[in-house]
């Protein structure tokens, strides 16, 4: 079965949903409901044998690239300072098809935000590249 990475883009949904404040400014009960939903998703995936891993991420990000043979790495807080998008977390899933990955991504996007309203996060669905199966010589 193919594996997919579901990348959760916080503050990347349609107007006005991308204007939700950062989670550290949510009411405690809203944070608890959001985390409970994430656990619920993981449990559903585990029950179906589709769960591989999941993780939440902090909003702090550092972009790094090779600086050259005798140079230090180049770092920045992001190549696109005009965007307020950040990757808030991810699920790695092992599912039957791309259609199933999209179905799960849509469900994850409905996760509750402040006041219990859906966040409408954009979920980036990325198939994991697989290694070519080993071949045997018939000679």
Model-identified regions with their sequence ranges:
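Conserved, structured core segments of small domains
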Residues: 1-139
